[in-house]
C-alpha cells in the first residue's frame, strides 16, 4: 500500500482557550486532490497553515513525506535541528494564498526564479528555462518582463501558481485562491488549477467555496465543522449525497 504523503494523527490546535482543531485524523495519498470545505471559522486555514509548518499543533502528530514535523523538537529539544528539518519539509510544499504576495519590484520571471536560485541554490539557466515553461503553462508566456502592478488579479494569481510550481513541490496548497478576485477573473484561475489537477501527480489540498469546482476535480472532500472533520468521502458522496444536516445547511447557503 502506498504510504500517505501527509498524515494528521489526532491533531489539536488551540489559540489561548479557544480550541480551533479538535482531533483531526487525515491521510492524503501522494497524488490525491483534496478539497476542504466548511463554514467560516471552522479551521480550514489553520489546517493549511499547519501543513505549511507555519503553526505548531498543540498536540498530535503531523507527518509529511515520512517526516514527523515537530517530533524532533518535542523529543530532543533540538530547536536548531528541528528548524533544519522544517526547512526541508517546506521545500516540498508549494502554497498559493488568497492574496498573491508577489514581489512588486521584480518582473514576473524574476518572481518565479528567485526562490530556486536563492533558497535551493539551483543553476540560474536551468531555473530560467523552467520558469519560462511554467509561465507559459499558466498562459503568461508573453508577460515575462512585466511587473506585478501591470497585471490583472487573475494574472497575478497565475504567476503565484507558476512561482510555487517552479519549486517542484510534492504538495500544493491553495487557500481560497479565488476569493479576492473579481468574479470575471475567477474562471481563468480555476482553469489553471483544473489543468494541474488533471495532469500533475502531486498532491493538492484546496480550501474552496467553489462547490462545482470541488465536484469536478477533487478525489476527496472534507467538510470541516467547528474544528472536526464532520464528513469525508468522494466529492459526490459529500457534496451531492450526504445526509449530514449541518453540511446540507452549509451547502444550501451557497446554492441560495
Ligand atoms: N493566530 C490566531 N490567534 C487566535 N485565533 C486564531 C488565530 N488563527 C486563527 N484563529 C481563529 O481560529 C478560528 C479558525 O480560523 P481559520 O482561519 O482556520 O478558519 P477558516 O475555516 O479558514 O475560516 P474562513 O473561511 O473565514 O477563512 C477562527 O475563529 C479564527 O479567529
What are the language-model segments listed below?
Residues 4-235:
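ABC family nucleotide-binding domain
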Residues 236-256:
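C-terminal boundary and immediately downstream tail of ABC-type ATPase nucleotide-binding domains
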